[in-house]
Amino acid sequence: MSQVTENKVISAPVPMTPLQEFWHYFKRNKGAVVGLVYVVIVLFIAIFANWIAPYNPAEQFRDALLAPPAWQEGGSMAHLLGTDDVGRDVLSRLMYGARLSLLVGCLVVVLSLIMGVILGLIAGYFGGLVDNIIMRVVDIMLALPSLLLALVLVAIFGPSIGNAALALTFVALPHYVRLTRAAVLVEVNRDYVTASRVAGAGAMRQMFINIFPNCLAPLIVQASLGFSNAILDMAALGFLGMGAQPPTPEWGTMLSDVLQFAQSAWWVVTFPGLAILLTVLAFNLMGDGLRDALDPKLKQ
């Protein structure tokens, strides 16, 4: 009898760690795994672009203007994806453009997330007049088209990568404020918060130590989706001439510079467009997987 009991104890399943549980639910979404693999590849290219890119992104080959990709007639293996109207290698510019796009996306998400979380915690925890003021400002910002608002801000401060990133941060801010506030309103009346308040915990400890960790799941999902929105909006600003300025290798600017050659040299617009499309799609797929892995309702 004791032998049977011992065997049962030994064969009991080992509980998963939080990281193992997260990966268990995340990998069930095959699209999210594909998106993660693509993002890792793009991140690798962005980090090591200096070493793996064939040429400097600003280097011009005047004897190979609008050269087609290597597999087309007239193409060359020296320029695998062809060249643009001034002889710059398209593949090299795409690789360096990945670095800029990911950097801007990261900057926008981090800044908007930090400011949005702080404002959302204040609005949800204190309520009353403070909540009304913050949320009415947020409502006004959400009433304006996001890209139009970003264009106006960049036009005021001048077109540049930094100003475009700050404008996109301002545009993305309301989403994090509302999401954080909604999560705080759910948590603020729970027993553990009340007990902590009775024990003498101050407002700062309540907001950032007790409540904030329980609001992370929806914020992580929104940050993933916000990353793709930042890349897409940055490309749109670059396309309109309000983002990165030539000759900076940025995907939207690459499209804007060669738009007049779209019919005669399809590769100069197709490859930057595909880079934007696939990167945005990959982050959106990752966002779906993160939601599946972090939302308790979807785990059931």
Curated annotation (Swiss-Prot):
Pfam families per record: BPD_transp_1, OppC_N
Membrane topology: Multi-pass membrane protein
Keywords, sorted A to Z: Cell inner membrane, Cell membrane, Membrane, Peptide transport, Protein transport, Transmembrane, Transmembrane helix, Transport
Cytoplasmic side, ranges: 1-31, 123-136, 228-230, 287-300
Signal peptide as annotated in the record: none
Membrane-spanning parts: 32-52, 102-122, 137-157, 207-227, 231-251, 266-286
Observed phenotype of the null mutant: Inactivation of the gene abolishes use of heme as an iron source.
NCBIfam families per the UniProt record, alphabetical: PRK10913.1 (NF008160)
Function: Part of the ABC transporter DppABCDF involved in dipeptide transport. Responsible for the translocation of the substrate across the membrane.
Name of the molecule in the record: Dipeptide transport system permease protein DppC
